[in-house]
Amino acid sequence: METIVLGVEPRVIKKNEAEKLRKSGLVPAVVYHKGEETVAVSIQELALTKLVHSAESHIIDLQFPDGKLKRSFIKEVQFHPVTDRIIHADFQLFSADEIVEMVVPVSVSGESVGVEKGGKLQIIMHSLTLKGKPTDMPEHFVIDITALDLAHSIHVREIPMTNYPGLTIMDEPDAPVITVLATRKEVEAAAEVAS
């Protein structure tokens, strides 16, 4: 997994301070770690937006003004309901051997049998919550869809973990991740064959 350096500035929590930060192109955020005091910081909105909207998960080295780097990942991001701008972010610090839960984007590999038959591929879960060491986390969680047929789905429990030793998927086991929908044409053709 790629490591990104992101500069942060400590901030003071005061009434209306968050709105002033946002107007000046900064995003209020917090940095926390088990057993340590939460630190309020601000981050350049443009840099954070690029990072959040990339299709990969990252380990982030937060760089403080004194030059210290603290290894973290994004735990939560809050968006404005109308403008979709980032209004707040939470970063979780971690140590090398610590077990954490992290959201990782899903990507697919292979050509689905069902799509070749005219079906439509639908990714239902665009990300999965994985538990393990942050250094074991992939940038993408790749799922092979080669055997996925028409009107079938791949559920969380059916995803092989051989390429991801030491990681566990924390999402609901019965949740569908990817499906191939039969189009109206395929449904009508199946009905004609059945009659």
Curated annotation (Swiss-Prot):
Keywords: Ribonucleoprotein, Ribosomal protein, RNA-binding, rRNA-binding. GO terms for molecular function: 5S rRNA binding; structural constituent of ribosome. InterPro entries: Rbsml_bL25/Gln-tRNA_synth_N, Ribosomal_bL25/Gln-tRNA_synth, Ribosomal_bL25_b-dom, Ribosomal_bL25_C, Ribosomal_bL25_long, Ribosomal_L25_dom, Ribosomal_uL5_bac-type. One of its GO terms (cellular component) is cytosolic large ribosomal subunit. Pfam families: Ribosomal_L25p, Ribosomal_TL5_C. SUPFAM superfamilies: Ribosomal protein L25-like. One of its GO terms (biological process) is translation. It comes from the Bacteria. Part of the 50S ribosomal subunit; part of the 5S rRNA/L5/L18/L25 subcomplex. Contacts the 5S rRNA. Binds to the 5S rRNA independently of L5 and L18. Belongs to the bacterial ribosomal protein bL25 family. CTC subfamily. This is one of the proteins that binds to the 5S RNA in the ribosome where it forms part of the central protuberance. This is Large ribosomal subunit protein bL25. It comes from Chlorobium chlorochromatii (strain CaD3). The gene is rplY.
